[in-house]
Amino acid sequence: KLSPSGMKLLGQGTVYAIYAVLAITYLVQVWKIWQVNAHVVKNPVPELQRYSFTQVAILDLAYMVTFGTELAVVSMLALFYVDMFSVDKITAGMLAGSYAVINLIARPAGGLLSDKFGRKVTLIIVFIGIAASFAVVSQVDQTWALPMVILAATFGGIFSKAGSGAVYAMVPLIQRRLTGQIAGMTGAYGNVGGVAFLTVLAMVSTPVFFMTISATAAVTLVFIALFLREPKGHMTEVLPDGTVQLIEVN
């Protein structure tokens, strides 16, 4: 976007230098990853320390959709109201701000529902809601009544924010000794989602942007339904004296 072929804010030499730095950084990270994890490849991992990385990957993808949607939508929602419905900027800002406030209720509710009804079923429900609500928002045009648009966007916000809570309700249950690492990586993918969705918005129309969110949520829903496993039984923790404690996850 900033190169001579885009906004022309950077020279071609600068662009190539940035590409080179990114490539070198990538190679260094690959080498560091191998150094840290080589022992896992060379030696068998104790049974108590094993976990399925597929579960981590699905939660990363899920949080990319839920929190990424929050970041992207709250960044453009006020301008959407101004451009589409000629709402004054103060009102548009207040409406967009109310979208963010939903987080205070919806995210804890997602965690609460996960504890009460199960992690996987809650994730399935909220992702159905995300896909459906943003598919509806993608159909909005100037003939729609503004309250209906606000209602549709609010439902999308409720489901996406509840989804963030539901994702983190499951993160500590993958492998207790790695909870911090798994939580950190999952959280990082939320920012990845925000950048990815806003990049899409920079290249396409607003309806296509909302439909992209809906389609990504639908694909993630399939992965959750087919491959995510509901935590059952017990997780283990090795105490300082070397004994193993079983912790019920249900």
Where are the language model's segments positioned?
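Extracytoplasmic gate region of multi-pass secondary transporters
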Residues: 1-14, 54-100
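Symmetry-related core transmembrane helices of the 12-TM Major Facilitator Superfamily/SLC fold
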Residues: 12-28, 209-227
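Residue-level signature of mid-helix packing/kink "hotspots" within the transmembrane helices
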Residues: 100-108, 191, 195
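Helix-to-loop junctions at the C-terminal end of transmembrane segments
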Residues: 106-118
